[in-house]
Amino acid sequence: MTAFSLEPAQLAWCAELRALAAERLRPLAEKGEPGRVNRALLAGLGTLGLLPRLFTSGALDLCLMRESLAHACTEAETALALQGLGAHPVHAHGTEAQRARWLPRVSDGSAVAAFALSEPDAGSDAAALTLAADPDPRPGGSPGWRLTGEKRWISNAPEADFYTVFARTTPGAGARGITAFLVPADRPGLTGTPLDMLSPHPIGALAFDAVPVTPDDVLGEPDRGFRVAMGTLNLFRPSVGAFAVGMAQAALDATLAHTAARDAFGGKLRDLQTVAHQVAEMALRTESARLMVYAAATAYDDGAPDVPRRAAMAKLLATETAQYVVDRAVQLHGARALCRGHLLEHLYREVRAPRVYEGASEVQRGIIAKELYRTLDATANGTAGVTANGTAGVTTNGTANATANGTAGVTTKEAGA
């Protein structure tokens, strides 16, 4: 592909996905219960071959998939994204046994995955998490840990079949003392409660009462779990932007149709300059956000050294743009857009959360600024910065960098997704 356009095959695939979302997935979504995992919808995503693509697609294809689904069915987009977020650490860092047990079931929609990072007192400052993984000597058995504490704002909780859980194995070590665990939902001591959120997706809290885990449950290496989290988020942040772009485009399309047909003041709304200029601004911002999302995803796929900055820029611009565009669309539609069941009423509830989860807008600005200054300092000092996917973030003298190693915090797609 070129820097500023998609290939015909990619455009055709996006059109096919929009049609599938409208014709096959939207009916399944409408039968779901708000706030609950829609297993029929997940099975539909698996049957259509979309869930397996979470593990075979690059970042750009993931963005195209999420944008296209979001345009016609935000519930399908979110169900797919949450499967990817929860299962990507297993795909990228799991053992053969872990992958063999869970990934086929994630791919066909029969197992629900969840990404459990945020806590009541550790959202944006994710490195401050306190879920304790206390050593469990287990006389006569393999040594392990006991998980004690809470997770909150966890998408797909408490109905998920397994959780990627991030817990503190080394107290006082900050981001360097966190380990990622694969925790099946049936482990003794693990309980959860649903949370009633603005948007209709399943969100919950988890309580860990000495939940047993072993070395066989570790994803990656002990005390290196924050790299697992940040590697996952660097992949998914641009595609959160794609989700936002899909919603913005849906709102823009609805606004074009409405203003072209609506009679007011002796003519059509489209003929009023104040309306036309607002529509033009909505289109300008949507297309700008789309291009930045595609650029960030392409940088990830190319192994570019500035992925954390580009991913943060893409998520920030796209989610803020979608909020603006949907709000303008509601304004131009008037009261009808606030009626329960209207497309824009639905989008208005959906569009708010992406500015919070997987790194709030304020966090993204912090990442961008730190990356800019880190690059400036690295140039001046002649040091290497981040690895191609941005997950290591180590200079040549072996010191960890902020944001590249993930010290810029996150609230994952757990907060009102």
Give the predicted meaning of each segment:
Residues 1-72, 93, 105, 109, ...:
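Alpha-helical interface subdomain recognition
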Residues 185-212:
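Flexible, small-/acidic-enriched active-site or ligand-binding loops
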Residues 131-135:
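A structural signal for short hydrophobic beta-strand segments in well-ordered beta-sheet cores
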Residues 204-232:
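A short, charged helix-loop
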Residues 142-144, 148-191:
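A short core secondary-structure module
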